[in-house]
Structures are given as C-alpha cells and as structure tokens.
C-alpha cells in the first residue's frame, strides 16, 4: 500500500526503542534514603534496553532463543512483548556498591517497529509469517487482540499561548481573566503545565504543577531564583523592547518591591523561600539530609520551563512571556485559544508509552526503597547486590508487565502525576478489521479527548480554517463525537523524532540577530522583533531585516541545509498596520521543530521543490490550488493535489465535490461498516467476528487514491445495474428492491466468520483433553473429539467431546448458535510450557448471509437503503437491450440529498462498462468549463446510448413500453454489516422479570421488543386503544390488588379473619359462634367495607412499594363500582 498509514506510529515507537528507553531511565529521579543503620543510599537507573519478543521458555536471552511472532500471539491469546533490561547504579555513603542489571518486565512491542521481528520482511516473507502482504504495523497485540493507541490532541509544546479565560478569575483573589499558558516538554517527552497569571494589582503569579497539584508562586520569586543579578539588571532585561511602556515598567518595579518587603534580596534567599514552601510536597524527591536550598533547586529544575537547560534561558523566556501577557492585557495582541489547530500537536503512541514506562520505572525504584527500608530493620541486615535483587523480586516486574498490558487492553491510564494529559481513559481501542478501510482509519484518527465530550461549548468541535490540509472536513462521526474525533488528511504526517537545531542560533546571528548579550549594541530606537525557537527566547532581529531573514531560512530549509531541520516551521508574525487597529498575534519570528507537530507537503514555487509546512506557519503563507491564482510577490506555495484536504476515507468517495457535504460525511462512516475482504490470512487469525463479501468486484470508477492505496486487494462492494424508477411501491423511504435472480446468482452474498476459542486449561478439571469415546459413534464429531471441517452444524448438535484423564469420563458439548454454521478451520494451539495433550482449540465457523429483507445497503455517496423486497425477475422492467436492473432505486432519493455525484457515477459506470475502461472519479477534475455530465454524456453517445443516461424500458408485468425514459446505469454498491439476522427481535412468550413481571430486555435473553412513548402515541392515533391495553397490560404485567377507597392506599390492605378481629375489638357472648371467614381489611382505616379489587400493572405495585420505603405515599382516587357501572 503506497500510503504511510501508520508511519508516525511506527516512527514514534522506533524512537522509544532506540532512544526513549534510555531517556526514561535517565529521567527517573534518584532515590535517596537512609537505612536503619544510618547508611545513606542512592539508587538510580543508568540504562534501559528493549529486546525483541521471544518464546518464554525460562531460558536466558541468547542468540538461540526462539522468536515469538505476532501470528502466534493472536492464536494463542498472548501479548506480543519484549523484555526490558535495565541497569541500576547503587551508591552507599557516596561509594558505588554495584551496577545491577536485571530484566524488569515485558513491554508490548509495536508491529513493524525496530523491536518487531516483522521489520524488514518482504511481502512473501510476511505471508509466510502469517501476516498480510501489505502489513504496515502501528498496533499492538495484547492477550491476542489487536490494539491501537489513537492520536490525542494536546497543546503545542514549548509555546506560550495568550489566553483570555473567565475561569482564571476563580483561581484566587484579585486574579484576572488574562494569562499566558505553556506546556513545557523535555526531550524525553516529560511534560508540565505552567500558567502566568495577571492580577488586578498589576503583579503576576506563576502557577506551577507538581503531581496534579497547582501551586501559585509570585513571578519575581522565580525570576530572582534564576539569576544572581541585581534588581536593575533584572528590570532592564524584562523591559527590553518595551522601555517606553510606563505601565509595564511600573508592574515590574512593584513586583521587585514586593520581593524587597519579603526580604528576598538575592538568588539564594529566593531559592530557599521556594524550597521551604515546597518542602512537604517534594519530600520523597529530596533526601532527608538535604536542605531547603536543594528542594528549591528541584522545583526550578522540574517545574519551571523544564525544556530549557540553563537558568539564563529560563530567565529570558519568562521575560518574553511577561511582555506577551502585558500586550494581551493592553489589547495590543489578539488572544489565542488551545482549540485552534495552530496551537495544537498530536501525542503519538510511542511518546505516550514512554511517559507511562518512565512512571512505572519510578514506581519500581520507590517500591525497592520501601522494601529495603523494611528489610534494614533486622539486626543482621547488610546491604548487598543480593539484597537489592531480593527487594526487586517478582512483584516489581509485574509493575511493568501488567501495567503496560493493562493500559493497552483497557485504554485506562493509572497515574499519580497525570503526565500532563487531559484524560485518563479511552487511549487505546480495538483495531477492528470489519474491512480494510475501517482498520486503516484507526491509525489516522485524532481525538480531542474524553474530557471535552461532556462540555456544552461547541468551540472545540468547530472546523477552523487553520485545519485546511491537516484535518479532513468530512471524516468525522455525525453523532456525539462529531468534531471531537477527527481524522488527519492523507498527506499529513506527524514529526516523531527530535530534530537537531543546535546550529540555528549561530545561523541567525550570522543573518543579523542580536543575542541577549549583543542587543545592547543595537542602535537606539531601532524596532525589533523577538525570535523564539521551540520555546527558547534567542534574541531580537530588526524589523527591517525580518522578512529577508525569514526568506533565507525558508530557502535553507527547502534546500535541506544541515543547519536547519527540513521539517521545521518558520513563521514571521508582523505587527498590525491596519488602520482599524485589528489585533494580530504577538509579533516575532518563530522557529518550531519539536516532535508532535502536524506537517504536510506543498510545492514551493520559488524553488520548484516540495516543502513541508506546519499548522502554525500555514496561517502566514499564501498557498494556492491553481498557479493562475498566484499573487505576484505574495504567493510562494501551491498544493500538490486539489484533494489534499481529504483523509484516507474521503479520498475514496467518487466525485465528492458534486455532493452535499453531509452525504460525504455519511459515506466516510458507512464505508467503514461495509462487508468486504478484511484480510487474506484467515488461517492465522482468531478474531471473534469478521465479515466477508464472497464475490467482491473492483469499481468501474476509480480514484487516484484507490490505486495508490491498493484497494483492489481488499475490495468493498459490487457493481450493480441501478434503475431510478418508482415501480414496486416497496422502494419508498430510502428502501430499495433487489432483483431476485441477481440474488440467486450471488449478488452481495456474504459470510460471517466467527472463531470460537475453547480453552480447557481454564476449567477446574485440568486433566481434561479433547477426545472422543472410540466405542461410541458420534457422526458430528471426529475421532479427535473436535468438529469435522466442512460439515454444517445445527442447534443442539454435539460438536466436541472432552475426556477427563483422572475419572475416565467423556462429556459432550452441544452447538449453541441459533443459526446453522459450517465448520471451517480447526486448530490446536499451545497454552504454555508443559501442556499435556490437546487443551486449547480454535474453531472457525462460517455463517452464510444472503441478502434478505431488512439488510442495509449503500452507494458510495451516503445513499443508504434497506432491502425491502426480492422482486421476481419476470416482473421487473427491462430495457430495449434486454438488461434487467439489479436494484430499483426510488427517484425521490435524489432531490433532498442532492447527491449529484451518484448520478454522474451512474452515467460514468455505464460508459466504463460499454467502453471496457476504468474512468477517473477523483475530486476537482472537472469544472464549469469541462463538466462531468458533458464528458460522460459524450462517451455514452459514442456507445450508442442516450446522452443523459436515460433508456426506454418495458413493463415486466404486461410488456408495454413505458411512456417516460428511465435513468439507468451502473453504481458501485456496498453491503453494510447491519443485517436483520443480527437484529430482528420477536417473541410470543419468553422469560419475564421476576420483580416487574414484564418481559426481560435484551435480544440474547429472548426479551421483548422495546415499546416507547412514540409507539404508544402511534397506536392511540390509529384509534386502537384496546390493542394498547391488551399488549401493554393484559399480555404484559397485568396484576390484581386490593385497595382501600377510603384512604386510597394500595399497601395497607391485608387479609384477616373476622374471628380474630372480633376477639380483639369486643367481648363475645358465650353462646355466640366464631366467624372464621377471611376478609380483606384496611389496616389504616380498620374497616373492610370500602376495600375493592383493582386491576393494575405489576410495575405500579413495585413503584408504590419503592416510594413507601422512601417515606413517600401514593394515594389513589377510586370511584365506587356502582358509579362506574352506572347502576
């Protein structure tokens, strides 16, 4: 498949294997603690290496270790994971004790990555290994299931975003709605959020995040902790570029004065003040023998602009953020929003796993610390390598193995620190293989986050102009996730590796940039633009040179100059010169080359070469579709293809530019629900349920993307002759009629393939194997006790037999599917080491699914319909040439849907069939001067057909010619997986709920159909109220109960005898006989003359009892029976 559908997933995991594991080991803070005997111990990871998956035979890793392939994991239900080997450096009292190397656990391996055995295999080798010939990888195998981590949208890293947010006022007293937010990210992808808040007093507070807690620190505390310079130098550094702004100058002086009042006079005092306030929060990260100075340094290092290494760089970047915040407060720059793709990036699977791995390693070393502290309480304890290995134990390895597998299996993130991600669930999903389009779309999906699903605002769902070329405008669900679950375009890719930008500062200095040390040499009064590179404030450039510097950098980037990464973004944001003072972004030159950015290729017209641009710089570029639209001196870029705005699925819609937009949205969803050829390696898969179209065809109309993606290897539909005519009456309301003869010849014939996993190892009788009693003949079971391949099985037929080797008993198991099924492949797989006999079987069932009434079909234009009738061929209309349509389509489906693309496809399909060619249906090929209708109409004329695709038809009933011409052509139809056999629900009798006495819900339980308010209203509107009473009461949960008319209670009536009541209430004469007749008596009123038998629903009695338990009484208004009957 000539499309990098999952390249960024694989590249990100390659980063994890090659560099990430080592980064994670180095990023884990050293554990410093003191044992009971007084020894000071320091433990730290020094190295980490990820190995390829191997068979777990208990042997050490050697060159002879057997490799574990993905196909084996799918069938055996295993996790495709490799061993993580780490080195732990241990120091005692400042002297090195040892460097311990140990396998810490297993980490799931992404297919086709550097850690996978499939890497580098040819197509033939992939087929031999049980994989698809075009396998691209990008997913994991966990417990036999394929899992993919979806792309997650995050704030752009290392970029200060100016925000106006009303909720900022709720942060504390005197807080305003203005702030500058930055998501600071290290090279190892460790991230922290920090926000600079503006207070109504003119001062500023810096919000720091540590382990999900937010701490507010005065800005100047942090600034003075970063530098040992005096207040005058600090003030000059912060005011550089805004010396004439008296308001800003007063703000800086006020904050410095506050520091004087708090006696924060130098760098050490500032660090100590910060350390004393954070000492409790970082107690497990600072050794007991270290003072507040070390705690303060830890906060500066791990919570403040962590992507910068030196304090001087942090000082200058904070100065930039302060100036940007003041510009926002004064209305000099436009506010920004994290909902804009310009300020977003994608968190890729490898980077997310790296963060989880780092935290798991941090948890392990903390567990070892606590174990050693416990072990040191014994008198004879001596800290040795053996003691550390014992402390590591088996439970620490499960932290990695089980933790990583749990994350991928459930998609839930269990974390203490939060990892600067806005959600804790929904990270991974099952990579469903309903068809190839569905499978591929998982890798191209990009999600905003589960947190935003609950928000009422629609801002996060909007399709913004900045998303052009990066986010597909039509490939998004039409339900609740609309606008939140998007898909990147086919040409979009994501930067996953770290770019070398170390030469950029020197290059900028050569081009005329003033560094912070040389800016004092700038001529007085010269206007300057700040230069920011990946959140690092490099210096200033004169406004007069800014444009020429930006052009030079772009030329160097396109020419792939080694000094600047070719995937970097270069943007010049100019000051607003508009007369109406329309605000722009904060001006400056921005160079962005971090990982996680979305980039796409365009053509640079000046250099006639392909250039990759990003979401930030695209806003300030002029990109045209047609060279004739180029504006001299302004336009420098052109799109490579007009369809660059569509995703993988969007590029497979024929003539999408002729359809209404919602129809393209529907097709993107329905294309992923189509029965087709999902895989070719059926023999090596163990999916619970898969769909297969038995006789698929390639479409008569193809797109450029169709050939590029090799979709003919996995076709999705059938070419059908479609007549647009109101003929049968069964084609109303989106229904369609199928030719019964076409159905009988296999039109849209499909099968459902299920794999049943029978694992005897999990049963209580571990001595059980598959085996049939040789003395007993069972025709439905083979000698090995397993079903016979190729045989058709029906409900309650015996399909496998087990034998208990301890008791000698045979046990038969009956077929439990309601539909008959053919037994396909029967496989015996190993469960693990030491298996004795056949215990784990995979049985493949093939269920035939011919199109029947109620099955769903759709064209490639979002025109979905239900098969309403299989019409006999002798009664269908036929053309002059004897052609009988396969499908009757109602003409009323066109006007409201405006799917002109389907009409063009009908004409073009007929022309393609008559000329024996495949025609191009790519978008934007035709225009107003060269229309598609005219092009294909002329082709039809050459073939002897009507220009508009109309034909003369004859009635199939009486053979008379129809007065009107019928629009007739070939359309590629898809059969969707929504089949009536999976959904129909009808019953006469069945199980009922023991409490409500109503039918249980659920199709699998044999429950009743759902009946709601709309159905009730429909029956009332038909004037059939008695049917309503009969169905919903008499035949559902009708019940009888006694109620007291006097007090209206349904619960106070109890059965009692007159004799007992007489003895309690009054004295009885000696000769008076006892009356033992039982009667219904109201316990509240103590009378029985107003107790009547009522007919009520059982669920009403249950509701009354439930409300009574909550001390709520229901009082009924009951008429006397004489009034009801009229007597």
UniProtKB/Swiss-Prot annotation:
This protein's GO CC annotations: mitochondrion; nucleolus; RNA polymerase I complex
Pfam hit, one: RNA_pol_Rpb2_2
Catalyzed chemical reaction(s): RNA(n) + a ribonucleoside 5'-triphosphate = RNA(n+1) + diphosphate
Means of activity regulation: Antisense ribosomal siRNAs silence rRNA expression during the elongation phase by decreasing rpoa-2 occupancy downstream of the RNAi-targeted region in nrde-2-dependent manner.
Keyword set includes Lyase: no
EC number: 2.7.7.6
Reported phenotype of the disruption mutant: RNAi-mediated knockdown causes sterility.
Top-level EC class: transferase
Keywords: DNA-directed RNA polymerase, Nucleotidyltransferase, Nucleus, Phosphoprotein, Transcription, Transferase
Any GO BP annotation: DNA-templated transcription
Localization annotation: Nucleus; Nucleus, Nucleolus
Phosphoserine modified-residue sites: 1025
GO molecular function: DNA binding; DNA-directed RNA polymerase activity; ribonucleoside binding
Subunit structure: Component of the RNA polymerase I (Pol I) complex consisting of at least 13 subunits.
Role, per record: DNA-dependent RNA polymerase catalyzes the transcription of DNA into RNA using the four ribonucleoside triphosphates as substrates. Second largest core component of RNA polymerase I which synthesizes ribosomal RNA precursors. Proposed to contribute to the polymerase catalytic activity and forms the polymerase active center together with the largest subunit. Pol I is composed of mobile elements and RPA2 is part of the core element with the central large cleft and probably a clamp element that moves to open and close the cleft. Specifically binds to 18S, 5.8S and 26S rDNA, but not to 5S rDNA.
Family under the similarity heading: Belongs to the RNA polymerase beta chain family.
Name of this chain's protein: DNA-directed RNA polymerase I subunit RPA2 homolog
Species in which this protein is naturally found: Caenorhabditis elegans
Gene of this entry: rpoa-2
């Amino acid at each position: 498949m000539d499309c990098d559908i999952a390249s960024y997933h694989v590249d990100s995991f390659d980063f994890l294997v090659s560099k990430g594991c080592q980064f994670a080991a180095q990023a884990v803070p050293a554990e410093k603690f003191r044992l009971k005997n007084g020894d000071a111990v320091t433990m730290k990871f020094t190295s980490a290496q990820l190995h390829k998956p191997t068979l777990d035979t208990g042997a050490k890793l050697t060159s002879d270790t057997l490799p574990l392939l993905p196909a084996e994991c799918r069938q055996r239900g295993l996790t495709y994971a490799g061993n993580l080997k780490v080195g732990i450096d241990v120091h005692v009292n400042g002297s090195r004790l040892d460097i311990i190397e140990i396998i810490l656990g297993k980490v799931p391996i992404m297919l086709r990555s550097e850690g996978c055995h499939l890497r580098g295999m040819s197509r033939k080798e992939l087929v031999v290994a049980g994989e698809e010939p075009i396998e691209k990888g990008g997913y994991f195998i966990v417990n036999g299931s394929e899992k993919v981590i979806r792309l997650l949208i995050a704030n752009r890293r290392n970029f200060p975003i100016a925000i106006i947010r009303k909720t900022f006022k709720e942060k504390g007293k005197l807080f305003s709605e203005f702030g500058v937010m930055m998501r600071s990210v290290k090279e190892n992808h460790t991230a922290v959020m920090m926000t600079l808040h503006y207070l109504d007093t003119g001062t500023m507070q810096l919000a720091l995040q540590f382990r999900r807690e937010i701490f507010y620190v005065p800005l100047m505390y942090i600034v003075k902790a970063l530098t040992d310079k005096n207040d005058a130098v600090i003030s000059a550094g912060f005011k550089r570029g805004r010396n004439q702004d008296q308001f800003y100058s007063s703000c800086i002086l006020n904050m410095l004065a506050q520091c004087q009042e708090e006696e924060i006079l130098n760098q050490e005092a500032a660090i100590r003040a910060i350390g004393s306030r954070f000492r409790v929060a970082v107690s497990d990260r600072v050794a007991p023998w270290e003072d507040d100075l070390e705690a303060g340094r830890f906060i500066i290092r791990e919570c403040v602009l962590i992507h910068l290494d030196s304090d001087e760089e942090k000082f200058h970047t904070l100065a930039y953020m302060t100036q940007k915040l003041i510009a926002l407060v004064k209305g000099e720059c436009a506010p920004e929003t994290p909902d804009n793709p310009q300020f977003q990036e994608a968190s890729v699977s490898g980077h997310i796993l790296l963060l989880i791995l780092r935290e798991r390693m941090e948890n392990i070393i903390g567990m070892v610390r606590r174990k050693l502290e416990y072990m040191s309480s014994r008198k004879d304890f001596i800290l040795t390598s053996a003691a550390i290995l014992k402390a590591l134990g088996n439970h620490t390895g499960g932290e990695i193995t089980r933790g990583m597998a749990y994350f991928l299996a459930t998609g839930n993130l269990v974390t203490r620190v939060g990892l600067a991600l806005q959600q804790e669930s929904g990270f991974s999903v099952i990579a469903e293989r309903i068809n190839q389009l569905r499978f591929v779309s998982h890798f191209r999906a990009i999600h905003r986050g589960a947190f935003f699903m609950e928000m009422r605002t629609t801002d996060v769902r909007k399709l913004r102009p900045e998303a052009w070329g990066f986010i597909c405008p039509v490939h998004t669900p039409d339900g609740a996730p609309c606008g939140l679950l998007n898909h990147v375009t086919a040409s979009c890719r994501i930067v996953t590796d770290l770019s070398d930008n170390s030469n950029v500062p020197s290059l900028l200095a050569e081009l005329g940039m003033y560094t912070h040390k040389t800016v004092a040499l700038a001529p007085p009064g010269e206007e300057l633009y700040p230069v920011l590179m990946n959140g690092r404030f490099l210096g200033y450039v004169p406004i007069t040179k800014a444009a020429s510097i930006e052009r030079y950098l772009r030329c160097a980037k396109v020419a792939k100059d080694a000094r600047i990464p070719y995937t970097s973004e270069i943007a010049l944001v100019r000051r607003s010169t508009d007369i109406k003072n329309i605000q722009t972004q904060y001006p400056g030159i921005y160079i962005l080359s971090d990982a996680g950015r979305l980039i796409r290729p365009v053509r640079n017209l000046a250099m006639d070469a392909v250039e990759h641009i990003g979401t930030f710089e695209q806003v300030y570029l002029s990109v045209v579709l047609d060279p004739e639209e180029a504006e001299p001196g302004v336009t420098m870029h052109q799109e490579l293809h007009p369809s660059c705005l569509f995703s993988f699925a969007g590029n497979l819609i024929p003539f999408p530019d002729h359809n209404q937009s919602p129809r393209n949205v529907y097709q993107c969803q329905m294309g992923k629900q189509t029965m087709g050829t999902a895989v070719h390696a059926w023999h090596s898969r163990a999916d619970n349920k898969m769909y297969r179209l038995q006789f698929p065809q390639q479409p008569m109309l193809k797109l450029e993307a169709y050939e590029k993606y090799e979709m003919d290897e996995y076709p999705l539909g059938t070419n059908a002759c479609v007549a647009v005519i109101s003929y049968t009456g069964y084609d109303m309301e989106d229904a369609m009629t199928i030719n019964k003869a076409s159905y009988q010849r296999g039109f849209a014939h499909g099968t459902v393939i299920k794999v049943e996993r029978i694992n005897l190892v999990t049963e209580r009788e571990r001595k059980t194997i598959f085996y049939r009693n040789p003395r007993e003949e069972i025709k439905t079971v083979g000698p090995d006790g397993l079903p016979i391949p190729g045989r058709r099985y029906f409900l309650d037929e015996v399909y496998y037999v087990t034998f208990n080797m301890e008791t000698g008993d045979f046990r038969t198991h009956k077929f439990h599917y309601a539909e008959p099924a053919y037994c396909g492949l029967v496989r015996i797989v190993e469960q693990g080491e030491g298996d004795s006999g056949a215990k784990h079987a995979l049985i493949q069932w093939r269920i035939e699914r011919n199109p029947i009434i109620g099955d769903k079909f759709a064209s490639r234009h979002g025109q979905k319909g239900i098969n309403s009738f299989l019409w006999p061929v002798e009664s269908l209309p036929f053309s002059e040439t004897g052609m009988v349509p396969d499908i009757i389509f109602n003409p009323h489906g066109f006007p409201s849907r405006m799917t002109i693309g389907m009409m063009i496809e009908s004409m073009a399909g007929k022309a393609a069939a008559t000329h024996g060619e495949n025609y191009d249906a790519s978008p934007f090929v035709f225009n107003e001067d060269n229309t598609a209708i005219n092009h294909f109409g002329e082709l039809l004329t050459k073939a002897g057909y009507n220009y508009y695709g109309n034909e003369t038809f004859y009635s199939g009933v009486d053979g008379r010619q129809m007065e009107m011409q019928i629009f007739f052509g070939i359309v590629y139809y898809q059969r969707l997986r929504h089949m009536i056999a999976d959904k129909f629900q009808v019953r006469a009798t069945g199980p009922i709920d023991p409490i409500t006495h109503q039918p249980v819900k659920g199709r699998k339980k044999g429950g009743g159909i759902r009946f709601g308010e709309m159905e009730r209203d429909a029956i009332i509107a038909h004037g059939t109220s008695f049917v309503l009473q009969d169905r919903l009461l008499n035949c559902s949960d009708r019940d009888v109960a006694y109620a007291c008319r006097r007090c209206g209670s349904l619960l106070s009536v109890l059965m009692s005898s007159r004799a007992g009541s007489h003895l309690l209430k009054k004295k009885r004469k000696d000769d008076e006989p006892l009356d033992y007749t039982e009667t219904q008596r109201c316990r509240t009123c103590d009378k029985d003359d107003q107790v009547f038998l009522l007919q009520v629903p059982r669920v009403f009695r249950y509701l009354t009892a439930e409300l009574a338990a909550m001390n709520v009484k229901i009082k009924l208004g009951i008429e006397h029976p004489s009034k009801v009957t009229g007597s």
